[in-house]
């Protein structure tokens, strides 16, 4: 059977079942999701060639995944720098930020220009918006979305390329075009429009009964891998 691509309503329902029926906590799933993102990045963009990563984090859970990924990427030998224009004032996100600070992961307060990003980084990790995003992009994030639209650096997007509609995908021809898309839990409908080189599935935590209920038809993760190529 074919892999299922989730619409927005289904993606929210799966998440809610993980929280309510299976009693996963947000921080538990965020840690597993962010770790799988770091592993997918490492498979596609080895630290030897792409050591400097600009990690762009949004205000919600997608941004939290980015903070987790930054911490694990640092442990894998990368040099991540975090751009977090609108930090979330909740203990979970404050703790994730604190962990990055304690690991001497730098952050920048201003969005880099296209020129400075090309000079200072080898890759951008796009962890701005998740499947709850609805256009238009808010003012706090316009500059970083424009950076990702204009840069020649490779981009790795977490779950949804920033600015894309979760179901319709790209809304304009100048939308973000990632080289790597890391779908989490299950791919969303917008992933059908993805034309980049690498598409991975991460978040190896979906209980078999939940997979059957939603007919997700997820691929088998090889061995002890935390992500699988789609």
Swiss-Prot record:
Record has Nucleotide-binding as a keyword: yes
PROSITE patterns referenced in this protein's UniProt entry, alphabetically: YJEF_N
GO molecular function: metal ion binding; NAD(P)HX epimerase activity; nucleotide binding
CC per GO annotation: mitochondrion
Cofactor binding mode and count: Binds 1 potassium ion per subunit.
Cofactor(s) required for function per UniProt: K(+)
Major enzyme class: isomerase
Record key words, sorted: Isomerase, Metal-binding, NAD, NADP, Nucleotide-binding, Potassium
Domain called YjeF N-terminal: residue spans: 11-218
SUPFAM superfamilies in the cross-refs: YjeF N-terminal domain-like
Coiled coil: none
Catalytic activity, EC: 5.1.99.6
Positions with a binding annotation for (6S)-NADPHX: 61-65, 130-136, 159
Catalytic activity: (6R)-NADHX = (6S)-NADHX; (6R)-NADPHX = (6S)-NADPHX
Keyword set includes Plastid: no
Positions with a binding annotation for K(+): 62, 126, 162
NCBIfam families: yjeF_nterm
HAMAP family: NADHX_epimerase
Family: Belongs to the NnrE/AIBP family.
Function summary: Catalyzes the epimerization of the S- and R-forms of NAD(P)HX, a damaged form of NAD(P)H that is a result of enzymatic or heat-dependent hydration. This is a prerequisite for the S-specific NAD(P)H-hydrate dehydratase to allow the repair of both epimers of NAD(P)HX.
Protein name per Swiss-Prot or TrEMBL: NAD(P)H-hydrate epimerase
């Amino acid at each position: 059977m074919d892999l299922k691509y989730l619409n927005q309503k289904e993606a929210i329902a799966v998440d809610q079942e993980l929280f309510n029926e299976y009693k996963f906590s947000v921080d538990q799933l965020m840690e597993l999701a962010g770790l799988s993102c770091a592993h997918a990045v490492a498979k596609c963009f080895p630290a030897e060639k792409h050591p400097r990563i600009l990690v762009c984090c949004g205000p919600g859970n997608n941004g939290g995944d980015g903070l987790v990924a930054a911490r694990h990427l640092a442990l894998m030998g990368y040099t991540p720098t975090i751009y977090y224009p609108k930090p979330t004032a909740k203990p979970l996100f404050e703790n994730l930020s604190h962990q990055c600070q304690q690991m001497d992961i730098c952050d920048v307060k201003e969005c880099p220009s296209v020129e400075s990003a090309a000079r200072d980084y080898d890759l951008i990790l796009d962890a701005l918006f998740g499947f709850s995003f609805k256009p238009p992009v808010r003012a706090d994030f316009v500059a970083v979305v424009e950076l990702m639209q204009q840069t020649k650096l490779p981009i790795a997007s977490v779950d949804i390329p920033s600015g894309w509609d979760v179901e319709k995908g790209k809304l304009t021809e100048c939308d973000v075009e990632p080289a790597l898309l890391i779908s989490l839990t299950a791919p969303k409908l917008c992933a059908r429009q993805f034309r980049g080189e690498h598409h991975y599935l991460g978040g190896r935590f979906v209980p078999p009964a939940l997979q059957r209920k939603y007919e997700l038809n997820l691929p088998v993760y090889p061995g002890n891998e935390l992500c699988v190529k789609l």
